[in-house]
C-alpha cells in the first residue's frame, strides 16, 4: 500500500477565529502556528500547506507571563556594524500588538516559501471586529492554565 500524499484539491480549508483576550502570547502562537500548518488534520504533510485560515481578534489584550514585558527582547539588525537594536516585547505590545503576535507566530513556522505562504493565512486585528464575516469563521477556544 502506498503512502497517501495530499493534493491541493483534497484540502478543505476552514476559517477559525481566536479571541486573544488574556491568552498568554506563547500559547496563542503555538496553537495558531499548528492551525496554520494543518497539524490538527489527518491529512497533514510537512511539505504541503494543509492549514486553515486563522483570524485573531482583541490582539491588544494578549497577556505575557512573568516579567517578560521588560526582560524578553525582540532583536533587529540594520546590517551595519553595531546596528543591533533590542526592544522589549512589552514596548512592542503597547505600540502595535498585531506585530508582536505575527512575530511570535512567524517564529514557530518554517522559514521558507511554505512558511511565508502559511503566514499569509493569518489575520490579526486589534479590536473585537474583523472584516471576514462573510467567511463564517468558527470560534476556536484555547485551553488556558490558570496563571
Swiss-Prot record:
One of its GO terms (molecular function) is mRNA binding. HAMAP family: Ribosomal_uL13. This is Large ribosomal subunit protein uL13. This protein is one of the early assembly proteins of the 50S ribosomal subunit, although it is not seen to bind rRNA by itself. It is important during the early stages of 50S assembly. PANTHER family: LARGE RIBOSOMAL SUBUNIT PROTEIN UL13M, RIBOSOMAL PROTEIN L13. Belongs to the universal ribosomal protein uL13 family. Part of the 50S ribosomal subunit. CDD domains: Ribosomal_L13 (cd00392). Coiled coil: none annotated. GO terms for biological process: negative regulation of translation; translation. Disulfide bonds: none annotated. Keywords: Ribonucleoprotein, Ribosomal protein. GO terms for cellular component: cytosolic large ribosomal subunit. It comes from Nocardioides sp. (strain ATCC BAA-499 / JS614). The keyword Ribosomal protein applies.
